Swiss-Prot record:
Top-level taxonomy: Eukaryota, Viridiplantae, Streptophyta, Embryophyta, Tracheophyta
GO BP: positive regulation of transcription by RNA polymerase II; regulation of transcription by RNA polymerase II
This protein's GO CC annotations: nucleus
Species of provenance: Solanum lycopersicum
Limits of the MADS-box domain: 1-61
Its job: Probable transcription factor involved in fruit development. Key regulator of the transition between the state of 'ovary arrest' imposed towards anthesis and the fertilization-triggered fruit set.
Residue ranges of the motif Nuclear localization signal 2: 138-145
Subcellular location: Nucleus
Domain K-box span(s) in chain numbering: 85-175
Biotechnology remark: Attractive locus for facultative parthenocarpy leading to the production of seedless fruits.
Short motif (Nuclear localization signal 1): ranges: 8-15
Major localisation: nucleus
Protein known as: Protein AGAMOUS-LIKE 6
Length: 252
């Protein structure tokens, strides 16, 4: 028959309890030794009996294992900081290497430092440049087509606005012609003003003759608008009086 399952509870009999402790202690120490040998693990085992007696096992020494345990468990913040620093250092190293590679690639694309490249690397570089040039030309053509389409759209919009304005002007002209009124264009007033100004530009005024005085000079030709006639007339009359006195002086 198989061995039955042992019920896990305190053994009341002191002799049986001591025998069980001895057997299981030896088995536990044996298993710790086997684990350290088979798996190359650092094992430390400490056992205190019910009477306070110490039993221990350490594959690398109890003291050394305890010191290592204290460094790992009693100072977790320091360990975390050290691990974080190491992680950041590795990340910086990776980024630095990537940055140097990108700088080297950029110099190659600019045609610099090509002496160290092989024929195959130069061919790959040539293909990259041709691909980049093709993409740049394609993008430029796309932008030009978009600009042309935008200009065509604006042209169509302006054409529609022009047609609407022509229709509106035609309707207004038709309404004025139907009512028998003149066309109220701004330039019609300008033409009328120009006609009036042209008709009043040249005026010939004969001065009044005095039969009691001697013969006066020939009629005076005055050129200008009506608003300047008053001032010119006053100055002209004064000049005529002076000339009349001179003529009378010669006559005497």
């Amino acid at each position: 028959m198989g061995r039955g399952r042992v019920e896990l509870k305190r053994i009341e009999n002191k002799i049986n309890r001591q025998v069980t402790f001895s057997k299981r202690r030896n088995g536990l120490l044996k298993k710790a030794y086997e684990l350290s040998v088979l798996c190359e693990a650092e094992v430390a085992l400490i056992i205190f009996s019910s009477r306070g007696k110490l039993y221990e096992f350490g594959s690398a020494g109890i003291t050394k294992t305890l010191e290592r345990y204290q460094r790992c468990c009693l100072n977790p913040q320091d360990n975390c900081g050290e691990r974080e620093t190491q992680s950041w250092y590795q990340e910086v190293s990776k980024l630095k290497a990537k940055f140097e590679a990108l700088q080297r690639t950029q110099r190659h694309l600019l045609g610099e430092d090509l002496g160290a490249l092989s024929v195959k690397e130069l061919q790959n570089l040539e293909k990259q440049l041709e691909g980049a040039l093709a993409q740049a030309r394609q993008r430029k053509t796309q932008i030009m087509m978009e600009q042309m389409e935008e200009l065509r759209r604006k042209e169509r919009h302006l054409g529609d606005v022009n047609k609407q304005l022509k229709i509106k002007v035609s309707l207004e002209l038709s309404s004025f012609e139907g009512e028998g009124q003149g066309v109220p264009f701004p330039w019609s007033n300008c033409n009328a003003s120009l006609d009036e100004a042209g008709s009043s530009t040249f005026h010939v005024h004969h001065s009044q003759s005095n039969h009691m005085d001697c013969d006066l000079p020939d009629p005076v030709l005055q050129i200008g608008y009506h608003q300047y006639m008053a001032a010119d007339g006053a100055s002209g009359s004064r000049n005529m009086a002076v000339e009349s006195n001179i003529i009378h002086g010669w006559g005497l």
